[in-house]
Amino acid sequence: MRSSASATATRPTVVQFFITCLLDHLYPDIAEACVTVLERAGVRVEVPPGQTCCGQPAFNGGFLAEARQMARHFLAVFAETTGPIVTPSGSCASMVVHHYPGLFAGEPAHQARAEAVARRIREFGQFLVEDLELRYVGGRPGRYTYHPGCHLSRELGVRGCAETLLAGIPGAELRPLPEAEACCGFGGLFAVKLPTVSAAMMQRKLENIAASGAETCVVCDASCMTHLNGGLVRQGRAPMVRHLAEILAEVGP
């Protein structure tokens, strides 16, 4: 870990916020929670106007020309900014980091721009722990368990950040999640193409969440949250899956 003096000198003070489609259209409260937490940590949050979808749904569906068009727009918006690009979605972050450069193979100028932007992408929890070196930034006591999203943990290789922040909440108990590494069954278009398999995976994940004894299951992707809470509601149960930012934005007992 860096010394406190060097950490203070190098820690980012301004970030660009990549809001994602789900938060922009369905969960603006989670976006607001992200801003609350970042500002509490002493970071100014800028939201570049004109940002749209990163193109992941089109890419996953095989519509590469359409995905490339959306990626060009994304790069045009964010390449003109400076500083880290923070996003509350490991899935969308992974799209930019791992798939944008390949989308522009044969287009050196766009590929170079994609690689430059990709180097600036930071997932929300990752930024708090790895860049700001925080261990506590907010949250209330409770029994939590954590479901690591596939793209965040496997493609980005980000592990332990959310757990660190949850464990740092005074009075919080972090319960282990059985089969934590197993997918929740969403997988974007996977849930549409193979709904029966997706539903079975979701049910197993819900059973494991219940077995953890936690009051709240925390995720870092709104897509996982939507999928799991949708399953709970269809079973007549109360939603209990929440985004990490929502948890950290709360302060006090």
Segments from the language model and where they lie:
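Iron-sulfur cluster-binding electron-transfer modules in prokaryotic oxidoreductases
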Residues: M1-P253
